[in-house]
Amino acid sequence: LVTGAGKGLGKACSIALAEAGAKVIILSRTKSDLDKVSKIIRKTKGSSKSFVCDVTQFEEFKRILQKIKRLDILVNNAGNNRPEHFTKVKRENMEYLTNLNMKAAFNVAQLCSQKMIKAKNRKKIGGSIIHMSSQLGKVGCEGRNVYNMNKFGVEGLARGMAVELAEYNIRVNTVCPTFVETPMVKQFFKNKKFKNKMLRNIPLGRVAQERDVATAVAFLAADSSEMITGTSLVVDGGWTAQ
């Protein structure tokens, strides 16, 4: 199951997982976006099922989850950012971002975990929960205080979950990308001064592509990472190494 699957990283992760053989359940608020992703997945001979859903609506997500017979992998991806200087953060923006990036991430993970645990052979087959975090869950950045707070919270959530869900053989990790060339980041990079400053902070000298992150997610979803839990896979071109 991939949340926020209509665009950007969620779309790329859904396609990568389908290519790897997963039966992908894709969620987004926008049906037209889901239709486009489903079409791409069909072209790769993959399998998908889509649901229109706002993950900030607890009961709505809960109802959709009841329609899903089996769940082995969660990519907890839905999120957003509204850059503002800390002293000028609007209350409505702080509440919107925290509801989506933290509260909804918690609720989705909790409900999915409960469903995964109920599988009779869970300890044998295992499971994987991957939170889409950020390098900004590791380091600070100007104009991103609320996002910093949210993603540091997601990092803590993942570690606590990893300890508690290990007894069910459910692994929990995060993927922490640098700035990725998604529709959202392209809007930020219209500010050339900001873009150039960000590029100077990436030793590899480029922003990440969606595929860079999607392949990291696919790795953490696969059996090849079966001994990896409670950690972060940082896809940042060296930013946080400095």
Where in this protein do the model-derived segments appear?
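Substrate-binding pocket helix/loop in short-chain dehydrogenase/reductase
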Residues: H85-F86, K90-T98, M198
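Short C-terminal tail/terminal secondary-structure segment
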Residues: V139, L204, A218, T229-Q242
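Conserved glycine-rich cofactor-binding loop
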Residues: G6-G8
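Residue(s) in the substrate-gating loop at a strand-loop-helix junction
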Residues: S134
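Conserved glycine-rich Rossmann-like NAD(P)H-binding loop of the short-chain dehydrogenase/reductase
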Residues: A22-K36
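Active-site helix of classical SDR
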Residues: A109, N150, A158
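Short, small/polar-rich loop/turn modules that mediate ligand/substrate recognition or access, typified
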Residues: A166-R171, I228-G230
